[in-house]
From Swiss-Prot:
Name this protein carries in UniProt: Acetyl-coenzyme A carboxylase carboxyl transferase subunit beta
Localisation per UniProt entry: Cytoplasm
Gene name tied to this protein: accD
Catalytic activity: N(6)-carboxybiotinyl-L-lysyl-[protein] + acetyl-CoA = N(6)-biotinyl-L-lysyl-[protein] + malonyl-CoA
Stretches assigned to the CoA carboxyltransferase N-terminal domain: 23-281
Example GO biological process: fatty acid biosynthetic process
Role noted for this protein: Component of the acetyl coenzyme A carboxylase (ACC) complex. Biotin carboxylase (BC) catalyzes the carboxylation of biotin on its carrier protein (BCCP) and then the CO(2) group is transferred by the transcarboxylase to acetyl-CoA to form malonyl-CoA.
Amino acid sequence: MVWFKRVKPFIRTTDRRDVPEGLWSKCEDCGAMLHRRQLEENLNTCNECGHHFRISPYRYFSILFDNEEFTEFDDCLRAADPLTFVDTKKYPDRVHDTIEKSGKTEACRNAFGKSAGADLVISAMDFGFIGGSMGSVVGEKISRAADKAIELNAPLIVISQSGGARMMEGAFSLMQMAKTAARLTRLGENRLPFISLMTDPTMGGISASFAMLGDLNISEPKALIGFAGPRVIRDTIKRDLPEGFQRAEFLQEHGFVDMIVHRKELKQRLAKTLAMMRVEG
Protein backbone atom coordinates (compact mmCIF):
# COMPACT_ATOMS: atom_id res chain seq x y z
CA MET A 1 0.00 0.00 0.00
CA VAL A 2 1.33 3.47 -0.96
CA TRP A 3 0.73 5.99 1.78
CA PHE A 4 2.39 8.98 0.09
CA LYS A 5 2.56 10.19 -3.49
CA ARG A 6 5.36 12.47 -4.63
CA VAL A 7 3.99 15.41 -6.56
CA LYS A 8 6.33 17.42 -8.79
CA PRO A 9 6.30 21.10 -7.86
CA PHE A 10 4.80 23.45 -10.41
CA ILE A 11 3.67 27.04 -10.68
CA ARG A 12 -0.04 27.52 -11.10
CA THR A 13 -0.76 30.10 -13.77
CA THR A 14 -3.91 31.99 -14.50
CA ASP A 15 -5.70 31.57 -17.79
CA ARG A 16 -3.82 33.25 -20.60
CA ARG A 17 -5.39 36.41 -21.94
CA ASP A 18 -4.59 37.52 -25.45
CA VAL A 19 -3.58 41.16 -25.69
CA PRO A 20 -4.78 42.80 -28.91
CA GLU A 21 -1.93 43.56 -31.29
CA GLY A 22 -0.96 47.23 -31.43
CA LEU A 23 -2.43 48.02 -28.02
CA TRP A 24 0.94 49.17 -26.67
CA SER A 25 3.71 51.19 -28.31
CA LYS A 26 7.28 51.65 -27.13
CA CYS A 27 8.78 55.14 -27.20
CA GLU A 28 11.86 55.19 -29.42
CA ASP A 29 13.56 57.79 -27.21
CA CYS A 30 12.96 56.81 -23.58
CA GLY A 31 11.62 53.27 -23.95
CA ALA A 32 8.37 53.99 -22.08
CA MET A 33 5.45 51.67 -22.85
CA LEU A 34 2.46 53.73 -23.95
CA HIS A 35 -1.13 52.54 -24.21
CA ARG A 36 -2.80 53.25 -27.55
CA ARG A 37 -5.56 55.34 -25.96
CA GLN A 38 -3.05 57.37 -23.97
CA LEU A 39 -0.95 57.90 -27.09
CA GLU A 40 -3.94 59.14 -29.10
CA GLU A 41 -4.98 61.51 -26.31
CA ASN A 42 -1.47 63.00 -26.39
CA LEU A 43 -1.64 63.44 -30.19
CA ASN A 44 0.86 60.59 -30.67
CA THR A 45 3.52 62.11 -28.43
CA CYS A 46 5.22 60.47 -25.45
CA ASN A 47 3.98 61.87 -22.15
CA GLU A 48 7.30 60.90 -20.53
CA CYS A 49 9.89 62.52 -22.81
CA GLY A 50 7.83 64.38 -25.45
CA HIS A 51 8.98 62.22 -28.37
CA HIS A 52 6.82 62.81 -31.46
CA PHE A 53 5.69 59.67 -33.26
CA ARG A 54 5.16 59.90 -37.01
CA ILE A 55 1.53 60.39 -37.94
CA SER A 56 -0.44 60.34 -41.19
CA PRO A 57 -1.74 63.33 -43.14
CA TYR A 58 -5.28 62.51 -41.96
CA ARG A 59 -4.10 62.74 -38.34
CA TYR A 60 -2.65 66.20 -39.00
CA PHE A 61 -5.89 67.22 -40.71
CA SER A 62 -7.92 66.11 -37.69
CA ILE A 63 -5.60 68.05 -35.36
CA LEU A 64 -5.53 71.30 -37.34
CA PHE A 65 -8.99 71.62 -38.89
CA ASP A 66 -11.96 72.67 -36.75
CA ASN A 67 -14.17 69.77 -35.62
CA GLU A 68 -12.04 67.45 -37.79
CA GLU A 69 -13.99 68.69 -40.81
CA PHE A 70 -12.12 69.12 -44.09
CA THR A 71 -12.41 68.47 -47.81
CA GLU A 72 -9.71 66.48 -49.56
CA PHE A 73 -8.91 67.33 -53.17
CA ASP A 74 -6.82 65.95 -56.05
CA ASP A 75 -6.76 62.45 -54.58
CA CYS A 76 -7.20 60.94 -58.04
CA LEU A 77 -3.61 61.54 -59.20
CA ARG A 78 -1.44 58.44 -59.68
CA ALA A 79 2.23 57.98 -60.49
CA ALA A 80 3.27 57.18 -64.07
CA ASP A 81 6.39 55.23 -65.05
CA PRO A 82 8.25 57.47 -67.53
CA LEU A 83 11.55 55.58 -67.17
CA THR A 84 10.12 52.03 -67.09
CA PHE A 85 12.21 51.73 -63.92
CA VAL A 86 13.05 48.35 -62.41
CA ASP A 87 15.03 47.59 -59.24
CA THR A 88 13.97 44.53 -57.26
CA LYS A 89 10.56 44.98 -58.89
CA LYS A 90 8.94 47.18 -61.51
CA TYR A 91 8.06 50.68 -60.33
CA PRO A 92 4.31 50.36 -61.15
CA ASP A 93 4.26 47.08 -59.22
CA ARG A 94 5.94 48.75 -56.24
CA VAL A 95 3.38 51.57 -56.26
CA HIS A 96 0.50 49.10 -56.61
CA ASP A 97 1.81 46.90 -53.78
CA THR A 98 2.26 49.93 -51.52
CA ILE A 99 -1.31 51.07 -52.21
CA GLU A 100 -2.64 47.56 -51.48
CA LYS A 101 -0.59 47.19 -48.30
CA SER A 102 -1.02 50.66 -46.81
CA GLY A 103 -4.39 51.76 -48.18
CA LYS A 104 -2.73 55.05 -49.15
CA THR A 105 -2.70 56.36 -52.69
CA GLU A 106 0.39 58.61 -52.67
CA ALA A 107 2.98 60.22 -50.43
CA CYS A 108 1.04 63.49 -50.20
CA ARG A 109 -2.56 64.49 -49.45
CA ASN A 110 -4.26 67.86 -49.87
CA ALA A 111 -7.20 69.26 -47.93
CA PHE A 112 -8.88 72.56 -47.14
CA GLY A 113 -11.20 73.63 -44.36
CA LYS A 114 -11.52 75.96 -41.40
CA SER A 115 -8.88 76.28 -38.68
CA ALA A 116 -9.68 78.57 -35.76
CA GLY A 117 -12.57 79.84 -37.91
CA ALA A 118 -10.41 80.90 -40.86
CA ASP A 119 -9.87 79.25 -44.25
CA LEU A 120 -6.75 77.11 -44.50
CA VAL A 121 -5.18 74.80 -47.10
CA ILE A 122 -2.87 72.00 -45.99
CA SER A 123 -0.64 69.74 -48.06
CA ALA A 124 0.77 66.93 -45.89
CA MET A 125 3.35 64.31 -46.81
CA ASP A 126 3.32 60.70 -45.63
CA PHE A 127 6.53 58.78 -44.85
CA GLY A 128 4.50 55.58 -44.89
CA PHE A 129 4.25 55.68 -48.70
CA ILE A 130 7.65 54.82 -50.24
CA GLY A 131 9.40 56.88 -47.57
CA GLY A 132 7.36 59.98 -48.36
CA SER A 133 9.50 60.42 -51.47
CA MET A 134 8.68 63.21 -53.90
CA GLY A 135 7.83 62.14 -57.42
CA SER A 136 5.83 63.88 -60.11
CA VAL A 137 2.51 63.31 -58.29
CA VAL A 138 3.75 64.80 -55.02
CA GLY A 139 5.17 67.82 -56.84
CA GLU A 140 1.89 68.29 -58.71
CA LYS A 141 -0.17 67.99 -55.53
CA ILE A 142 1.88 70.61 -53.68
CA SER A 143 1.64 72.90 -56.70
CA ARG A 144 -2.13 72.43 -56.83
CA ALA A 145 -2.35 73.12 -53.10
CA ALA A 146 -0.73 76.50 -53.77
CA ASP A 147 -3.28 77.13 -56.54
CA LYS A 148 -6.13 76.19 -54.18
CA ALA A 149 -4.82 78.60 -51.54
CA ILE A 150 -4.85 81.40 -54.11
CA GLU A 151 -8.36 80.42 -55.23
CA LEU A 152 -9.65 80.51 -51.63
CA ASN A 153 -7.50 83.50 -50.66
CA ALA A 154 -6.22 81.36 -47.78
CA PRO A 155 -2.83 80.58 -46.20
CA LEU A 156 -1.01 77.38 -47.15
CA ILE A 157 0.72 74.99 -44.77
CA VAL A 158 2.95 72.26 -46.20
CA ILE A 159 3.83 69.49 -43.75
CA SER A 160 7.04 67.74 -44.79
CA GLN A 161 7.78 64.13 -43.84
CA SER A 162 10.05 62.64 -46.46
CA GLY A 163 13.35 60.95 -47.22
CA GLY A 164 13.81 63.05 -50.38
CA ALA A 165 13.33 62.67 -54.12
CA ARG A 166 11.88 59.46 -55.58
CA MET A 167 14.77 57.80 -57.40
CA MET A 168 12.44 55.63 -59.52
CA GLU A 169 11.41 58.75 -61.47
CA GLY A 170 14.93 60.12 -61.98
CA ALA A 171 15.09 63.67 -63.36
CA PHE A 172 11.28 63.89 -63.36
CA SER A 173 11.48 63.76 -59.57
CA LEU A 174 14.25 66.37 -59.36
CA MET A 175 12.21 68.71 -61.57
CA GLN A 176 9.61 68.90 -58.81
CA MET A 177 12.06 70.86 -56.64
CA ALA A 178 12.04 73.77 -59.08
CA LYS A 179 8.37 73.33 -59.93
CA THR A 180 7.14 73.56 -56.32
CA ALA A 181 9.48 76.44 -55.49
CA ALA A 182 8.28 78.41 -58.51
CA ARG A 183 4.61 77.77 -57.76
CA LEU A 184 4.98 78.86 -54.13
CA THR A 185 6.27 82.27 -55.22
CA ARG A 186 2.74 82.98 -56.50
CA LEU A 187 1.52 82.94 -52.90
CA GLY A 188 3.84 85.85 -52.14
CA GLU A 189 2.61 87.68 -55.22
CA ASN A 190 -0.93 87.29 -53.86
CA ARG A 191 0.15 88.32 -50.33
CA LEU A 192 -0.78 84.95 -48.86
CA PRO A 193 1.27 83.32 -46.08
CA PHE A 194 3.11 80.07 -46.69
CA ILE A 195 4.13 78.16 -43.56
CA SER A 196 6.44 75.18 -43.77
CA LEU A 197 6.11 72.60 -40.99
CA MET A 198 9.05 70.19 -40.93
CA THR A 199 8.58 66.86 -39.17
CA ASP A 200 10.80 63.81 -38.78
CA PRO A 201 12.36 63.29 -41.28
CA THR A 202 12.66 66.17 -43.74
CA MET A 203 15.58 65.21 -45.94
CA GLY A 204 17.10 65.37 -49.41
CA GLY A 205 15.32 67.27 -52.16
CA ILE A 206 12.50 68.23 -49.80
CA SER A 207 14.75 70.23 -47.47
CA ALA A 208 16.56 71.62 -50.53
CA SER A 209 13.35 73.02 -52.00
CA PHE A 210 9.95 74.01 -50.60
CA ALA A 211 10.51 72.89 -46.98
CA MET A 212 12.94 75.75 -46.37
CA LEU A 213 11.04 78.39 -48.34
CA GLY A 214 8.30 79.23 -45.87
CA ASP A 215 7.53 82.74 -44.73
CA LEU A 216 7.82 80.93 -41.42
CA ASN A 217 9.72 77.66 -41.04
CA ILE A 218 8.40 75.61 -38.12
CA SER A 219 9.54 72.23 -36.87
CA GLU A 220 8.40 69.57 -34.45
CA PRO A 221 10.88 68.83 -31.63
CA LYS A 222 13.96 66.76 -32.50
CA ALA A 223 12.96 66.34 -36.15
CA LEU A 224 15.76 65.17 -38.45
CA ILE A 225 16.25 67.88 -41.09
CA GLY A 226 18.98 68.00 -43.72
CA PHE A 227 20.14 67.03 -47.19
CA ALA A 228 22.41 63.99 -46.90
CA GLY A 229 22.13 61.82 -43.80
CA PRO A 230 24.58 62.26 -40.90
CA ARG A 231 26.27 58.90 -41.54
CA VAL A 232 26.93 59.81 -45.19
CA ILE A 233 28.38 63.19 -44.18
CA ARG A 234 30.55 61.63 -41.48
CA ASP A 235 31.93 59.04 -43.88
CA THR A 236 32.61 61.73 -46.49
CA ILE A 237 34.41 64.33 -44.37
CA LYS A 238 36.01 61.75 -42.04
CA ARG A 239 35.14 63.79 -38.97
CA ASP A 240 32.75 63.46 -36.06
CA LEU A 241 29.69 65.68 -36.28
CA PRO A 242 28.52 68.09 -33.55
CA GLU A 243 26.06 66.69 -31.03
CA GLY A 244 22.48 67.02 -32.24
CA PHE A 245 23.64 67.78 -35.79
CA GLN A 246 20.69 68.03 -38.24
CA ARG A 247 18.13 68.01 -35.44
CA ALA A 248 15.54 70.79 -35.27
CA GLU A 249 17.09 72.37 -32.17
CA PHE A 250 20.52 72.57 -33.85
CA LEU A 251 19.01 74.17 -36.96
CA GLN A 252 17.05 76.69 -34.90
CA GLU A 253 20.24 77.66 -33.07
CA HIS A 254 21.90 78.31 -36.44
CA GLY A 255 18.98 80.26 -37.93
CA PHE A 256 17.46 77.71 -40.31
CA VAL A 257 14.32 77.06 -38.26
CA ASP A 258 12.23 79.93 -36.87
CA MET A 259 10.18 78.07 -34.29
CA ILE A 260 9.93 74.62 -32.68
CA VAL A 261 6.38 73.77 -31.65
CA HIS A 262 5.06 70.80 -29.70
CA ARG A 263 2.22 69.04 -31.50
CA LYS A 264 -0.20 69.79 -28.66
CA GLU A 265 0.36 73.53 -29.15
CA LEU A 266 0.48 73.46 -32.94
CA LYS A 267 -3.06 74.55 -33.81
CA GLN A 268 -3.09 77.38 -31.27
CA ARG A 269 0.33 78.69 -32.29
CA LEU A 270 -0.53 78.54 -35.98
CA ALA A 271 -3.82 80.38 -35.41
CA LYS A 272 -2.05 83.22 -33.57
CA THR A 273 0.73 83.40 -36.15
CA LEU A 274 -1.61 83.43 -39.15
CA ALA A 275 -3.80 86.07 -37.51
CA MET A 276 -0.75 88.35 -37.28
CA MET A 277 0.26 87.59 -40.89
CA ARG A 278 -3.21 88.09 -42.33
CA VAL A 279 -3.51 91.00 -44.76
CA GLU A 280 -6.93 92.61 -45.04
CA GLY A 281 -8.22 94.02 -48.27
